[in-house]
């Protein structure tokens, strides 16, 4: 048996393969900010601003956004988070704007009635003479 030439271990990788594998770079893109799920805002909307179940819809989309974020699907999480934000804004507007408009109408109506009452009191306190009827 001739053992004069060096033998290579068949299980050991060659130096060329090791160098190529050691310097391989993968470009994954720049990681952006994690998408927001607006969970706390959705819970608040569900508890206090749940007109037409918009707060509940916001909560459902917030849970879906959190699930997608945990699963690693950031684009779907961003979409669900955006929908949750829109439903939270709608729930807040539909719950807070009508009472504020009603309050504004009551205040302006009260001011108008007080002016009208003052003018009518001045009208009825006027004393007419006999000459005014002739």
Curated annotation (Swiss-Prot):
Biological processes annotated in GO: bone mineralization; bone morphogenesis; in utero embryonic development; regulation of bone mineralization; response to rapamycin; response to tacrolimus; skeletal system development
Biased amino acid composition, Basic and acidic residues: 1-20
One Pfam family matching this protein: CD225
S-palmitoyl cysteine lipid attachment residues: 52-53, 86
Region feature (Disordered): 1-31
Ranges of the Extracellular topological domain: 1-39, 110-134
Cytoplasmic side: 61-88
Induction field: By interferons.
InterPro entries with a match to the protein in the record: CD225/Dispanin_fam (IPR007593), IFITM_antiviral_protein (IPR051517)
Tissue: Detected in embryonic bone (at protein level). Highly expressed in osteoblasts of adults and embryos. Expressed in primitive hemopoietic cells.
Subcellular locations according to the entry: Cell membrane
The keyword Nucleotidyltransferase belongs to this UniProt entry's keyword annotation: no
Top-level taxon of origin: Eukaryota
Protein's membrane topology: Multi-pass membrane protein
Modification comment: Palmitoylated.
Transmembrane residue ranges: 40-60, 89-109
Misc note: Membrane topology is controversial. The N-terminus is cytoplasmic and the C-terminus extracellular according to PubMed:24715519, while both the N-terminus and the C-terminus are extracellular according to PubMed:18442316.
Cited function: Required for normal bone mineralization.
The protein, known as: Interferon-induced transmembrane protein 5
Lineage: Eukaryota, Metazoa, Chordata, Craniata, Vertebrata
């Amino acid at each position: 048996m001739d053992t004069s030439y060096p033998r290579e271990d068949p299980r050991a990788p060659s130096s060329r393969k090791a160098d190529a594998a050691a310097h391989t770079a993968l470009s994954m893109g720049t990681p952006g900010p994690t998408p927001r799920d607006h969970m706390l805002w959705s819970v608040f909307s569900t508890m206090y601003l749940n007109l037409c179940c918009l707060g509940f819809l916001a909560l459902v989309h917030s849970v879906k956004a959190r699930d997608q974020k945990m699963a690693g699907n950031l684009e779907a999480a961003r979409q669900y988070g955006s929908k949750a934000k829109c439903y939270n804004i709608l729930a807040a507007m539909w719950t807070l704007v009508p009472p504020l408009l009603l309050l504004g109408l009551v205040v302006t109506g009260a001011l108008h009635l007080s002016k009208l009452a003052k003018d009518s009191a001045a009208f009825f306190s006027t004393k007419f003479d006999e000459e005014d009827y002739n």
